[in-house]
């Protein structure tokens, strides 16, 4: 293999040391909080049949047209590395005939072929939350509250804004779509190429454009709130009232539509100004028609995903290493005893390391970090059934009988 290929693929990143522990902390904290809200953890493969995503994300979405990693396997099946979780979780819900209402938590890597930049990679990681089986506005409020709860415990609320919009029911969206198309057609030649295409295939997606020329045109675009039916207006009012009751601050943003076709009614993002253009830390909304569109029952649903890389870039986290035990056997017989002692201590839940070679006491101690507890033993200790316990942090050393060793270590770890 060429040396140039022996490195990370562009848009991917190795995780180790402090960064790995930060990722693990975010994931574990998110799952622990999800447990309080009644979620159960599930896992799906990172590969799915391509149809799982093309059938749900929208033929004109950026993910389907530009970003999915597709390939044919050796049997000729069209396979895709998952670009998002929700479609795969819905597939699981249908395949396993899960009884609703049910709340599902998942996490792991997702893959999109995008131009790598700060907080945007081709392989990145998400924690994902899906609530199937409730059409109540209060379910939307609770999901937003869950995201807010997680960001609060990550100590990020000072840097975060909750932005929310309401796309409405079918009647609302159809009326608004006609008005938006009528408005945008006046400026069709001035729109970006992507927006000209979306104007034909999915006009609401134009609202999602970050192009400066599009943003200028959209300043005077119709407001979807002017087209709400009574159902839509009442639903959104109840969502906002719920957020007010929980003292969760928010900003209305009628430009939020989300980039996937399955969203309806409530859509929201938790954003920050500290990550440049990749400003959404959490994003989600309601997708009541998705389960039915994939062949399942008519099942209302609401959910969101949180980007671990983006959260990791915002938080300060110092992993606290637990103190480990290092064996320093002196002599051949002590080496044999070390193998047995290491096994016994590990079976009792203690982290143990040793060198497997006798390179001299001073030399071995020099290579041990200050957070360790060292067990030194040679011929004399083997005869008296004792161990010398040295605390590298304090320099204190004491002789401990083998029968009291566990208690001595538990007191120091």
Curated annotation (Swiss-Prot):
Give the location in the cell.
Cytoplasm
Please give the catalytic activity noted in the UniProt record.
tRNA(His) + L-histidine + ATP = L-histidyl-tRNA(His) + AMP + diphosphate + H(+)
* Superkingdom classification of source: Bacteria
Output the InterPro entries linked to this UniProt entry: aa-tRNA-synth_II, aa-tRNA-synth_II/BPL/LPL, Anticodon-bd, Anticodon-bd_dom_sf, His-tRNA-ligase, HisRS-like_core, HisRS/HisZ, HisRS_anticodon
E.C. number, please?
Answer: 6.1.1.21
| Keyword RNA-binding among UniProt keywords | no
GO molecular function annotation: ATP binding; histidine-tRNA ligase activity
Q: Which GO terms describe its cellular component?
A: cytoplasm
Q: How does it assemble?
A: Homodimer.
Name the protein family.
Belongs to the class-II aminoacyl-tRNA synthetase family.
This protein's name: Histidine--tRNA ligase
* Lineage summary: Bacteria, Pseudomonadati, Pseudomonadota, Alphaproteobacteria, Rickettsiales
Q: Tell me what gene encodes this.
A: hisS
